[in-house]
Amino acid sequence: MPMRALLALFLLLPGLPAAALDLLPTTLQLPAEGGRTELWLHNPGPERWQGEVQILAWEQQLDAERLQPSDRILASPTRLDLAPGARQRVWLLPRSAVPVAAEQAYRIVLAPGRSSLPRYSLPLFQGAAAPSVRPAVRARVESNGSQTHLRLDNPGRLHARLDGLSFESVGGHRSVLLPGLAGYVLAGRERRWTLPARRDGYLGGRFRARLQDGREVVLDAWDPSIAVNPPAGL
């Protein structure tokens, strides 16, 4: 059954008014060599929903998400007008048929015509979605004295979607840090997330999370043991 777009990475405006949309799927995939994929919209509310589809190239830096308008992905239609109860299919396809050498990440944004309504953002990835390839995300805890951060590195060629992030202490006690969607680490990128304070500073334990295929994995440490303070020069 459809999931509210709140299950996407973020809902750009707070609150979920009556004019919300159902979106399916909430993660989109295009093959490396082209092809197309479809996004279905459903307006279950009593009001008409009008807006447009925007395509944004998605890049990540250590502490920031970078979104820029892109013409590499085409949407059809781009203008949306859904009466109450109506459904609409949006086709998404690459402008070029040349295969991409590395996974490309985008955000598909549904921007309403009324500023009082929420904008929705869904991830789209173009590249080989090999089910046998598991993202190899590495984790390190960093502390600057006032804040503690979890630094994640994804050296692989496939993005990592992390759900249910938890920490398991040396004694085996598990603490849930983020029960739902924790976030994404794009292929070849690093991200840093703030952690809640902990008396032992996360010393000696390990982090667990579920990947996009539903498997729970241990996030490998960059060093033989996860240290609170990173070595000099990192």
Regions found by a protein language model. Name each.
Residues 13-18:
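N-terminal signal peptide c-region/cleavage motif recognized by signal peptidases
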Residues 19-45, 79, 133-144, 182:
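Beta-sheet-dominated interaction scaffolds and their linkers
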Residues 2-9:
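Sec-dependent signal peptide recognition
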Residues 37-43, 85, 90-92, 106-111, ...:
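Buried hydrophobic-core signal for structured, non-transmembrane domains
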Residues 62-98, 172-201:
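Intrinsically disordered, low-complexity Pro/Gly/Ser/Thr-rich segments with frequent PxxP/GP/PP motifs
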Residues 144-234:
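Intrinsically disordered, low-complexity segments enriched in serine, threonine, and glycine
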Residues 45-67, 155-173:
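Short acidic, flexible loop segments centered on an aromatic residue
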